[in-house]
Regions:
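Short, low-complexity intrinsically disordered segments enriched in A/P/G/S/L with frequent Arg
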Residues: 13-14, 22-27
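Intrinsically disordered, low-complexity serine/threonine-rich segments
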Residues: 11, 18-19, 41-44, 48, ...
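Hydrophobic alpha-helical segments within soluble ligand-binding/sensing domains
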Residues: 172-175
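Extreme N-terminal basic, low-complexity initiation segments
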Residues: 2-12, 16-18
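Nucleotide and nucleotide-moiety/phosphate-recognizing core
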Residues: 49, 54-167, 177-191, 198-204, ...
Length: 251
């Protein structure tokens, strides 16, 4: 008890010269009269830092997936059924990325976008099984249906026209049908790219969607592909309603 009383009596002494009895003790620590008050602004700074850190983490967890539907193989590149692939390739060009990672039964790319992650996917399953690839990637990266945007061909629209939808049925499109079946949901936004109707009701549908465009149709399609790419990105940034107002209709 003597030591503590003597230290208290000499609290103004130099920390290296505190007398104990007849001698001088080299203090192992700096003695302070009373604890320093913790400045309030430090607490505010630390609080703001962790709130900012948490918000940043939350933003990074918001993932999007854009899917372009089509068939693999060079023989299908310019067919009507591959309009979705052409549109997603255009998105990749705009974002300066390559869709070249082979996984999830598809080719995909990953890019940081608007504070989160964006995945671009080209299923390699052929059109009618596209949902398998979509399900695998979306499940792995935890992308909900509401943030899966699908680009695909629509024979009910003339070349050069786009139509955006928040959700809905497959409408006779086997690729969309497969996605709905695999996800167990039809609540995902989509961008329909007009490729023209069959020239005659008796014309075989498979033959029609696997045919190529005429020169005149191709001329109308090229700007529509560019607008479809912009429309998909706009859905992410502004929502489906704003994107539909901007991009539905003529290219």
């Amino acid at each position: 008890m003597d030591i503590y009383r003597k230290q208290s009596d000499q609290m103004d002494a130099h920390p290296s010269e505190i007398n104990v009895g007849d001698g001088t003790m080299a203090a192992p620590y700096i003695y302070i009269k009373k604890p320093l008050a913790f400045p309030a602004f430090y607490a505010i700074f630390i609080l703001k830092y962790y709130v900012h850190k948490d918000n940043t983490t939350m933003k990074e967890q918001v993932n999007w997936l854009i899917v372009g539907l089509g068939n693999p193989g060079r023989e299908y590149e310019k067919t009507r059924h591959n309009a979705g692939w052409r549109a997603i390739d255009r998105i990749a060009e705009k974002l300066n990325v390559k869709i070249d990672k082979l996984k999830f039964q598809g080719l995909y790319a990953q890019v940081n976008y608007e504070g989160g992650k964006l995945f671009l996917l080209k299923p390699q399953t052929y059109m009618n099984l596209s949902g398998r690839s979509v399900l695998q990637l979306s499940a792995f990266f935890k992308v909900p249906p509401a943030r899966i945007i699908v680009l695909f061909d629509d024979i009910s629209l003339e070349p050069g026209r786009l139509r955006l939808r928040k959700d809905g049925s497959a409408g006779g499109h086997n690729g969309i049908k497969s996605i709905i079946q695999e996800l167990g949901s039809q609540d995902f936004p989509r961008v329909k790219i007009g490729v023209g109707a069959k020239p005659h009701p008796d014309y075989d549908l498979a033959d029609w969607v696997l045919s190529t465009f005429t020169a005149q149709e191709e001329k109308a399609l090229v700007p529509a592909i560019d607008r479809a790419a912009d429309a998909a990105l706009c859905i992410m940034e502004k929502g489906i309603a704003e994107a539909s107002n901007r991009y539905s209709g003529k290219a």
